Amino acid sequence: MAMLEIRGVRKSFHTYAKPGVRPGIFGRAPKPVSSLDVLRGVDLTVEKGDVVAILGPSGSGKTTLLRCLNFLETADAGTLTFDGEAFDLARADRASIARLRRKTAFVFQNYNLFRNKTALQNVTEGLIVARKMPKNEANAIGMKMLEKVGLADRADYYPRQLSGGQQQRVAIARALASDPEIIYFDEPTSALDPELTGEVLAVMRQLAQEGMTMLVVTHETVSYTHLRAHET
């Protein structure tokens, strides 16, 4: 049985005549003046241990797909089956979403670190706040994850004191801290200078060798050819 299967994922974005007006406001639903079908019945299967790279140009819907899979966007239609449990991507309730997110992690293109927190605090925030883990236990996990990405000596540094590549490695450490079964990567190196890309790819290569399941969206064809990825 596949770890992750998605079937029939659809998502459209609509433009309305009056900015800010959305369906259901003031008692009736306005009709969109234009629509853009971003996802048109996407199907995908990911096996445990796979590294799947979704390649495409900017604006092709790659990031939208990833955000729909983690309920950062609501799809118009589609199902996601994870470890045998099915989720309706258009209608899942909060409890179902929370249950799924405990098994997944998301690495953002622009890191999404808290600017006022240290590297270690960024890694442990979710463990302490969302999972109610004791601080000393969370810190132990956080330091282990920072060591894994080669940044144990930067635990007390703030994002402004780190390079882009280091910030993205902190973001990967944060993802790993939640012990996910799969990590979604949204263009993880596209915001980096070429000389910093290698350090992030090295961490991802290590994770692939350890059997971490990863779904990566990117427009950089060459960068991911050594991650044992199959492309779609």
Say what each PLM segment does.
Residues N70:
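Helix-to-loop junction immediately C-terminal to a conserved catalytic motif
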Residues L55-P57:
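The feature captures the beta-strand-to-loop junction immediately N-terminal to the Walker
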Residues Y157-R160, S178, E210:
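Conserved signature/switch motifs of ABC ATPase nucleotide-binding domains
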Residues P194-L196:
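Helix N-cap at the start of a conserved alpha-helix in ABC-type nucleotide-binding domains
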Residues T189, T225-T232:
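Conserved small/polar residues in nucleotide/adenosyl-binding loops
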Residues F87-A105, K135-N136:
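ABC ATPase NBD coupling module
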Residues I183-D186:
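Catalytic Walker B motif of ABC-type/P-loop ATPase nucleotide-binding domains
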